[in-house]
Swiss-Prot record:
Entry binding sites for Mg(2+) 2: D24, E26, H182, D187
Protein name: Ribonuclease T
NCBIfam families from the UniProt entry: RNaseT (TIGR01298)
Annotated source species: Buchnera aphidicola subsp. Cinara cedri (strain Cc)
Top-level division of the source organism's lineage: Bacteria
Function description: Trims short 3' overhangs of a variety of RNA species, leaving a one or two nucleotide 3' overhang. Responsible for the end-turnover of tRNA: specifically removes the terminal AMP residue from uncharged tRNA (tRNA-C-C-A). Also appears to be involved in tRNA biosynthesis.
Family from the record: Belongs to the RNase T family.
GO BP term, pick one: tRNA processing
Length: 221
């Protein structure tokens, strides 16, 4: 294996100035504008000097359903969340997003990126809920790209021929406990490991950096 010493392996160079943040949202339905957001977790990422993507920090919040939101019985039965259980320690959408956006902006600045980009499994769902919640609480200087995402379901379908998170993780060599599935924190962590493996596997196979055959090679350190 080789690395290319003349390549800029900073994360901002790898993703065109975007900073990837892995997110999972659990909700009380599928309609982002009307159904309650119940739980959210994020995992930030970092890239080492050789260009390998790794997990960094994490945040996790249970969310109080916003006023007037719809809670669909079949959805909470599926994710096993009792929205009104006081032991959840739930906070408002505004409180959760304020802390999440603060951390993401910090990571964007540290890594000299321009904007955050959401990474999720079936990313359209999580992106819609995040943007709807951000709008409800007055945006709070939302650091995420308004429409571009990285979808690990699509990427896993390409690389592994599987779009189900548990099956993709298994093929990637990542443990997956189905008893913990649909916990926002657990799913976010496993999705983060999966995304890192997808990115790193592409690098191991020679797909990154692109068009690098002309570059000066040196033994990997």
């Amino acid at each position: 294996m080789f690395i290319y010493k003349d390549i800029n392996y900073a994360i901002n160079n790898r993703f065109r100035g975007f900073y990837p943040v892995v997110i999972d949202i659990e909700s009380a339905g599928f309609q982002a504008d009307t159904d309650a957001l119940l739980e959210i977790a994020i995992v930030t990422l970092k890239m080492n000097k050789s260009g390998w993507l790794k997990i960094d920090d994490r945040l996790h919040f249970h969310i109080i359903p916003f006023k007037g939101s719809i809670i669909k019985a079949e959805s909470v039965a599926f994710n096993k969340i009792d929205p009104f259980n006081p032991l959840r320690g739930a906070v408002s959408e505004k409180n959760a997003l304020k802390n999440i956006f603060k951390l993401v902006r910090k990571k964007i600045n540290i890594n000299k990126c321009r904007k955050g980009i959401l990474v999720a499994h079936n990313a359209n769902f999580d992106h819609n809920f995040l943007m709807a919640a951000s709008k409800r609480v007055g945006n709070l200087n939302n650091p995420f790209h308004p429409f571009t995402t990285f979808d690990t379901a699509a990427l896993s379908g390409l690389i592994f021929g599987q779009t189900v998170l548990a099956k993709a993780c298994k093929l990637a060599g990542i443990p997956f406990d189905t008893n913990q599935a649909h916990s926002a924190l657990y799913d976010t962590i496993q999705t983060a490991y999966l995304f890192c493996e997808l990115v790193n596997r592409w690098k191991r196979l020679g797909g990154w950096p692109p068009n690098s055959s002309h570059r000066k090679k040196t033994d990997e350190i």
